[in-house]
Amino acid sequence: MIKVVFMGTPDFSVPVLRRLIEDGYDVIGVVTQPDRPVGRKKVLTPTPVKVEAEKHDIPVLQPLRIREKDEYEKVLALEPDLIVTAAFGQIVPNEILEAPKYGCINVHASLLPELRGGAPIHYAIMEGKEKTGITIMYMVEKLDAGDILTQVEVEIEERETTGSLFDKLSEAGAHLLSKTVPLLIQGKLEPIKQNEEEVTFAYNIKREQEKIDWTKTGEEVYNHIRGLNPWPVAYTTLAGQVVKVWWGEKVPVTKSAEAGTIVAIEEDGFVVATGNETGVKITELQPSGKKRMSCSQFLRGTKPEIGTKLGENA
């Protein structure tokens, strides 16, 4: 039986681990990030992958830094035939990558060489792509740069969010891995080098990227809101207060107004001018210190005026 070590951390990784178990591989160990404090009460919380591994009585390693010798030697001591990673969250050292008989392969949520990095799902939507996918490739120490083994495309729907696409890609990754591993073991795959001229990056989202730039087109603002839903959530300011924007709709704007200005107030939301003739009607938001709510609910208690400028003093 093929001995596999799985390395992964978030919810995205869980279906991949589950599929390895269902397909009958001997998952002899799981490597995941350390437990972290979560929420306002800072409750020490295990990763989703750790929770899944413990359901199956699989030993779990949680290195703070996998590149340290005493940590990676614990992985090597398991003597895996194959290592599979999916959103592990740390750069894996060569000592591990070169050890398994069948190598170390990664399940990545984009069509490489596009969108290398830690936030490919967010960027696929924020950039307005109509499709993305899963790539399974050999791991190298350079970020997501290994030779490609298999790929599958996944359509991005008009109202897709990062949350819904995350779920689709997670399942697609598990399914593709199930088809890839047997072919890899049988030596039936021809690895393909990535074209470095086509490389783009999707680095982890920074706080300053979350703010809505109303000078962009309505389409770009709409994609920005979708791409940051449900985390970390796009934001703007209204009357000097931070407001998270959970959802909006593209609407035509007939009169010209400065980008970021409220040009219409309707029962279910207010329309904001952008950098072109497509406005964005905010329909779901979250004022600072309050719960997420519909814009109609918000408007019952707060009455912004037409001409109010959003995005100032953030």
Curated annotation (Swiss-Prot):
EC number: 2.1.2.9
One GO location term (cellular component): cytosol
Keywords, ordered alphabetically: Protein biosynthesis, Transferase
Pfam short name (any one): Formyl_trans_N
Coiled coil: none
Record field: catalytic activity: L-methionyl-tRNA(fMet) + (6R)-10-formyltetrahydrofolate = N-formyl-L-methionyl-tRNA(fMet) + (6S)-5,6,7,8-tetrahydrofolate + H(+)
Keyword Transferase appears in the UniProt entry: yes
GO molecular function: methionyl-tRNA formyltransferase activity
Residues where (6S)-5,6,7,8-tetrahydrofolate binds: 110-113
Gene3D superfamilies from the UniProt entry: Formyl transferase, C-terminal domain (3.10.25.10), Formyl transferase, N-terminal domain (3.40.50.170)
Known function: Attaches a formyl group to the free amino group of methionyl-tRNA(fMet). The formyl group appears to play a dual role in the initiator identity of N-formylmethionyl-tRNA by promoting its recognition by IF2 and preventing the misappropriation of this tRNA by the elongation apparatus.
Family label: Belongs to the Fmt family.
Protein name: Methionyl-tRNA formyltransferase
UniProt organism field: Bacillus thuringiensis subsp. konkukian (strain 97-27)
